[in-house]
Amino acid sequence: IVTQSYSTSFALATKMLAPSIRTDIYNIYGFVRLADEIVDTFHDYDKEQLFQKFEKDMEEAIVNKISLNPILNSFQHTYHKYDIPYHLVESFMKSMRMDLSKKNYETFDEYREYIYGSADVVGLMCLCVFVNGDKEKYEELKESAMALGSAFQKVNFLRELKADYEELNRTYFPNTNLMELDEESKKRIVNEIKADFAVGY
């Protein structure tokens, strides 16, 4: 329900997955989507407080292997089923926490750190499902999964460029003036994305 409500294209893409793993991908998507919604859209509430509660509930769900929150309960089930490394979850939550206060990414190191936590690790969580415990296959495909995560995230940055800047006062691309986005800057961003896709495929 969450996947279909928030991303029609992703919901359609998951129809190509085997039914045996489709629910687990939905479970991961539901978790990351809820975290993202808290930091990006709950403007009439104390987002910091909501995020802290969400993080605490997530940690308890993983430890106790159950949650009364259906999204977190579904996620912890997939987390344990595929032995998803906890450091992936930690990195994701760190990037989401950055969205609560950080508005500009001045250096490429900051930019890469955010993308790793907000996108690369999500690809790696999904990869855990796809390889179903095959550690050798996971290591073989790890770099490609991360590159695809980076590419799709940068495409999303471009798609949401105007909304992020005007509604959230947030910019992700370092050394880029959104008020004067010249052809050279656009070309650099597009070339970054092409390079990521080349590694991913």
Feature annotation, model-predicted:
Residues I1-Y201:
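Acidic catalytic motifs of isoprenoid enzymes
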